[in-house]
């Protein structure tokens, strides 16, 4: 994820960070300075159904600069990192062909990693084996993983059910540990572009305050009506759109299961917890080539960033 010196490679700007960190504002400011096109790299913002609750760009924002891959996927159709990465590659290519700078903006680390590093060519898991593994308790699965793939077990928390099950089913299905396949990733674009990455990591107390303020603003903008419309579609509860932050809490309030104050408290807590996980991920998963922004962004810094970017 470092800047390449090859003159044949086109530049790509990546602005990452947790929810409510100020990514969109920085992206627009940088895009104005660099003739950019903003490309969504946030899983929730792909979906058409939730503009307010996922903090998609406003109509005013989209009039300032072109925005791509926002609100393009119906909520009934779950998206994946691979699906998004293929679309992002096309949008990056289109931006370069039109003489503009592609600016990736988002907080979904898996999406970003898949685009840059590619995917591991893991063979399909037989449904019977998958069902067998996923019927185990997390304790049973972790114990089995410690025996069959101790390296994976050492990397995972004993309560991380999803990743434990995945590592165990891959080991049992292919006879190779997960890290074997991860070393064979293909399709990433990191070596084909000149990448400059920024990650915004506000202080924890400021991020918590921003999360709370943002949810209040979402309610003022009509988040409840948005969830009522979504509930009217009667989509399966396990779809990503139904698990978006705030949907479950607002839906519980609408059904009369909790009062309004409890709904607000629960939704804010869920937002803060999500932002905390993202903040931790970006602090530990990014290397020294990323420019880390820990404080408020001012116009002088934006000018400096733009000059640096245009010089690579």
UniProtKB/Swiss-Prot annotation:
Record-listed E.C. numbers: 2.5.1.75
Pfam family, one: IPPT
NAD in keyword set: no
InterPro entries tied to this protein: Dimethylallyltransferase, IPT, P-loop_NTPase
Cofactor(s) this protein requires: Mg(2+)
UniProt site positions, description: Interaction with substrate tRNA: 108
Source superkingdom: Bacteria
Keyword terms of this UniProt record: ATP-binding, Magnesium, Nucleotide-binding, Transferase, tRNA processing
MF (Gene Ontology): ATP binding; tRNA dimethylallyltransferase activity
Record bears the keyword ATP-binding: yes
Binding site for ATP: 17-24
GO biological process terms, semicolon-separated: tRNA modification
NCBIfam families assigned: miaA (TIGR00174)
Subunit: Monomer.
Function: Catalyzes the transfer of a dimethylallyl group onto the adenine at position 37 in tRNAs that read codons beginning with uridine, leading to the formation of N6-(dimethylallyl)adenosine (i(6)A).
PANTHER family: TRNA DIMETHYLALLYLTRANSFERASE
Family the UniProt entry places it in: Belongs to the IPP transferase family.
Protein name, as recorded: tRNA dimethylallyltransferase
Organism this protein belongs to: Zymomonas mobilis subsp. mobilis (strain ATCC 31821 / ZM4 / CP4)
Gene: miaA
């Amino acid at each position: 994820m470092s800047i390449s010196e090859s003159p044949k490679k086109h530049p790509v700007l990546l602005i990452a960070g947790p929810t409510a960190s100020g990514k969109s504002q920085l992206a627009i400011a940088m895009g104005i300075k660099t003739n950019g096109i903003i490309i969504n790299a946030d899983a929730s913002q792909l979906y058409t159904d939730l503009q307010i609750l996922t903090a998609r760009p406003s109509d005013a924002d989209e009039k300032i600069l072109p925005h791509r891959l926002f609100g393009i996927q119906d909520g009934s159709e779950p998206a994946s990192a691979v699906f998004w990465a293929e679309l992002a590659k096309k949008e990056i290519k289109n931006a370069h062909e039109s003489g503009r700078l592609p600016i990736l903006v988002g907080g979904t680390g898996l999406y970003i990693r898949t685009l840059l590093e590619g995917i591991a060519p893991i063979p399909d898991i037989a449904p019977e084996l998958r069902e067998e593994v996923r019927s185990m308790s997390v304790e049973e699965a972790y114990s089995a993983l410690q025996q069959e793939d101790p390296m994976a077990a050492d990397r995972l928390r004993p309560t991380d059910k999803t990743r434990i099950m995945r590592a165990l089913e891959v080991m049992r299905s292919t006879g190779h540990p997960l890290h074997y396949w991860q070393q064979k990733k293909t399709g990433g674009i990191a070596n084909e572009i000149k990448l400059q990455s920024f990650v915004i990591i506000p202080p924890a107390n400021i991020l918590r305050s921003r999360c709370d303020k943002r949810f209040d603003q979402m309610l003022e903008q009509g988040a409840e009506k948005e969830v009522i419309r979504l509930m009217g579609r009667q989509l399966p509860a396990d779809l990503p759109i139904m698990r978006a932050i705030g949907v479950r809490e607002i839906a519980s309030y609408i059904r009369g299961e909790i009062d309004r104050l409890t709904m607000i408290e629960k939704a804010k807590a869920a937002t803060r917890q999500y932002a905390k996980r993202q903040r931790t991920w970006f602090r530990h998963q990014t290397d020294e080539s990323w420019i880390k922004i820990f404080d408020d962004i001012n116009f002088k810094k934006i000018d400096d960033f733009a000059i640096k970017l245009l010089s690579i």
